Structures are given as C-alpha cells and as structure tokens.
Amino acid sequence: MIATKGRNVVVVGTQWGDEGKGKLVDWLTESAQGVVRFQGGHNAGHTLVIHGVKTALHLVPSGIMRPGVKCYIGNGVVLSAAKLFEEIEALEKAGVELRSRLRISEACPLILPFHAALDVAREAAREQGGQAKIGTTGRGIGPAYEDKIARRALRVQDLKFPERFARKLHELLDLHNHVLTTYLGSVAFDFGPTLAPYMADGKVLFQPVFDEAMRHAQLLKPMMADVSRELNEAHLKGANLLFEGAQGTLLDVDHGTYPYVTSSNCVAGNAAAGSGVGPGMLHYVLGITKAYCTRVGGGPFPTELAWEVEGTPGYHMSTVGAEKGVTTGRSRRCGWFDAALLKRSAQVNGLTGLCITKLDVLDGLKELKLCTGYQLDGELTDILPMGADDIERCTPVYETISGWSDSTVGVTQFDKLPTNARLYLQRIEQITGVPIHMVSTGPDRAQTILMRHPYLAD
C-alpha cells in the first residue's frame, strides 16, 4: 500500500541532466502533498506533457500542475525574481492557480542583472583568449553562487528592507563593475537586448536594478516563507514530500565532470541542505536515467556518437528523441548508455531505485551498445573516474545487445515490452546493482511502467 504519512522521496538525474525528471516528478505528485526545489536556478528546464499539452518550467517546481499540491523553493536555489514572475504569469495565463501554493525561502540568494553580465563576459573572454567555453547558459547562476559562498549575496529577505538592499547593492556593483570593465574588458562585448536596459559603457547601473528589485519585492512578499520550518511541520503532520533535483549528477560541482559542471550540488544529499530538513527525512532516492546518454555544452562524454551524421544510431537518438535543450534550445550530444557512469551516480546518490526514460527512442535500432567500463592508462576500470581530465583519457568498453523492431511507445506493463527491450533493462540492473522500479515509454503521464512505487511503504 502507498504510505499515507510522512514518506519523502528525492528525485535526481543520474547523467548530465535532461533525463526526463519533470514528467516523473509530475507523476509522483499524485502521491505527494508538497514538492520542493532544492538547488540550481532558471538554468534548468523541465518539460511536462499533460493530455498532449507541453508546459516548460525552469524555477517553479513541477508539482504546480497538480491542484492542491504545495510547492517550495528552498534556500539552495538561486532565484531570479524576473524569471520567476515570467513563469508565474505564463502559468496563470494557462489557467494554473499557483500564488497561494508557492512558498519561497527567504534565504534564497538573488540572481541580479550583474550576475548574468558576468556570466556572458566570462564566456566571451574565454573564447577571445582561445580557451574552451564551460558551456554555461549565460543566466548568472555561477556568479550568484559565488556571491553566496563569499558571504556577500543579496537574499530574498533583503528585499523587505529597501535601505539595506540599496547599501548592499552599491557594494556589489562597485566590486562586479570593476571586474567587468577592468579584468574582463566588458566595454567590447555585446550583452544582447535582455541586459541592455541595465547597462552603459560595460557597467551595470544601480537605478534600473534597484527599481526592478523593489517592484519584485512587493510581489514576492506574500510568498516569502521560512521553508525549513514549513517542511518540517508538514512532515510532522504526515505529509508526503517530493524533493525535485535539477540538472544531473555528472553536472554536480563536486562529483561531476569538473570543471564542466554547474555551480551547485545536484546529488540527493543536497536535498537536505538545500531545503532545510535533516537527512533522516529522506526515505527513498529515485535516479532518473535516460535509456541512452545525452549532454548539452562542452565537457567529456566517453560514449558520444556521431549524432550529427544522418543514418547513424546517434542521429536516430537525436532526431527521434527530439534532443534540444529546454532552457537554451541547444542540440544535445548523444551517445550509448554508460553503465559505468551510472555506477558512479548510484554511489554518490545512494539510489534506492531507477526510472529508465525514453526507452521508446531506441525502437528500430538493430543493435545497441552498453558501456561497462573504460580503458584508462592501460588499465580497465568499471566506474567513471573523477574529473574531466581523467575522463577525457577514457576509452569505453562495450557490450553489444540486439535491438528490437516492435514499438514500446505507451507500453504500461513490463512483460508486454519486446523481449530484447526487457533484456536490455535487465542488463542495466545487473551491471549497476540498482533495481529498475519504473520505465517511461513516452512523454505523457500515462505512458509509464511501474514495478515498485517510490511512495510504497518499506
């Protein structure tokens, strides 16, 4: 039976993001009373398809599409109020009532226009200097986390006190404008139409940033909350909570393909720190894993295929899987499933179970390859090394598995899958040591195979 009191589930991506977490979070909220975002910012994107209608979310937790479910943005999230209200207005136009159900931690650091300007200028300076781009979304996520770690960030709670906000903003602009103009040479860069209203001569201006922040303050005040307290109280009252990770494990600042990573911890352990609950409140960790691998932007990718070449398996994955980033629209690089990578993700997340997504994309491929390990400096290793430098030197070791021609689209029972599709999934379980509890066979809520429900009591 489904637990009726106080069972909490963490959903994390196990690859480089884009694994299909949004659909599964939406599916699981049928059994939850609250959904929590605990890290990242509006650099992450989730696409939900409900009754054939696509909805893209970047900051608002995916559970907002379920009437009556409370949604929380925890202290681990860096918040662009401008982007949040763009999203709120779009959802309200679509008929989703959410302001009374959305709670935002007062401890969230704010993303402000100078953070995005720093992001853009740094990538431009790297390119100008002949260095490889990190592949950021240019939305100010990294610089906002830098201010947090340096203990100088403006936080949501500062918006309640205009004089305090103005003083801190002046201090931050003095610092960041010096970096922009003197170190990065920002006068020479084109910052685009989004940042133009806030800038002059390569510097970010005080008044437009302050005025916009004060407008947002009035709108945010009804949603500001002590999220840590509210989550703990909800748990004590028996609510089921769902903690929604953004991006993926291999983008984690500590455990990912450093330095080609994001600026936050994407692993399950951060669900506690990023929302203000104790680790004992996290009962089940669901790892979302695409049936093949994709990656957006730069960085090592051991099993990458020639996904731009027509007629190849990689091209099949790219086109059939519609592999374009939700946030940036960039094409995702595609490759074979990497079980050695998944072993690393299982280790650092403490996965309870797996959900394999986009299995249907592999329909029609005659044969599939599974990476079981790598050759690294003449030795065989069965788990992904730490950091980009070692991963770049890895040569994948593959097993070949026969594909299937029958469609898996919309299949809702495991034993109704083609035989080779079942063998493929079972081999993933064997290599990684993590049981598969769910399989997604299409983008809609109903296109799901359930073997064990994460909210099922132990």
Curated annotation (Swiss-Prot):
GO terms for molecular function: adenylosuccinate synthase activity; GTP binding; magnesium ion binding. GTP binds at residues 17-23, 45-47, 332, 358-360, 440-442. Binds 1 Mg(2+) ion per subunit. IMP binds at residues 18-21, 43-46, 137, 151, 247, 262, 330. Substrate binds at residues 326-332. Keywords: Cytoplasm, GTP-binding, Ligase, Magnesium, Metal-binding, Nucleotide-binding, Purine biosynthesis. It comes from the Bacteria. Its cofactor is Mg(2+). GO terms for cellular component: cytoplasm. Its main location: cytoplasm. SMART domains: Adenylsucc_synt. InterPro entries: Adenylosuccin_syn_GTP-bd, Adenylosuccin_syn_Lys_AS, Adenylosuccinate_synth_dom1, Adenylosuccinate_synth_dom2, Adenylosuccinate_synth_dom3, Adenylosuccinate_synthetase, P-loop_NTPase. Pathway: Purine metabolism; AMP biosynthesis via de novo pathway; AMP from IMP: step 1/2. Belongs to the adenylosuccinate synthetase family. This is Adenylosuccinate synthetase. It comes from Albidiferax ferrireducens (strain ATCC BAA-621 / DSM 15236 / T118).
